[in-house]
């Protein structure tokens, strides 16, 4: 349950203690599980919250002094990135904008929870006509120029993100030989690989279950440029999920699994690897599914989107004129 009225606020002491906590290892259905989904900021959970918080912390002086005290991010409708960024902004006392594809207010499903939570955290929600992620990303770029805000991209400082995740490998048992996890951007699993080397773990193979080609891009951009002494000695075996990104996979598991992300990696693991404590599932997090959080969005529109709207209206008027 998210407590909006008594939400944590930033202090150096709280931040350093909170972000350096090691999340636990548990057992589920015969597999070991790294419960990074239990990392929590006032009810918003998961390892991505830690990544975003550290990214903002590392740039906090710049954001306050050079970016008008604000951050913004672009996100797809199913992505928890909008909620996470807004929650982190509230924690640090920053202004926040998010850009997402515009949708009608009558739609009520789990995909609409993130934008409503963003608004509840105080973010302004900017709607974009282009439903593909390229639409919000372009709008975010335009809004950076318009507002001066600092743009949050989880892949913008890949080395720092990987290092943040790598530190969580410290409490992985020495008998773990195989690690499985979901790969959206892929930085989480690349960070796990980095951590296995950092803490001299006995892991032989890591299976990132990919939802897109982003992991290959980020591996080339961030991981492959590491010094040989910082790279995982075992096999980094990328496998493609049989499910598309937009597909919701609902598994009958007592372990809470995100339907867009973690469930697909868990499904691959159970179909391909026999239960063993030597196999560890890396659970990054789970987004909020409670539909009671949904509220009407007070949509904002960037100057860029308003120009696009005017151009579309002009073309439509021209078509009507030509027809008659």
Annotate each language-model stretch with its function.
Residues 1-69:
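Positively charged, low-complexity intrinsically disordered leader regions
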Residues 63-86, 92-100, 177-185:
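A short, small-residue-rich loop immediately preceding and capping a beta-strand
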Residues 75-83, 105, 158, 181-192, ...:
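Gly/Ser/Thr-rich loops at beta-strand to alpha-helix junctions
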Residues 83-130, 215-227:
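Active-site-proximal loop->helix
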Residues 102-175, 233-256:
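Small/polar-residue-rich loop-to-helix segments that shape phosphate-bearing ligand pockets
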Residues 146, 232-278, 283-287, 295:
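Active-site-adjacent helical/loop segments in soluble small-molecule enzymes
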Residues 205-235, 241:
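Redox- and metal-dependent alpha/beta enzyme cores, enriched for Fe-S-associated oxidoreductases
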Residues 273-324:
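Phosphate-binding loop/pocket of nucleotide- and phosphate-handling active sites
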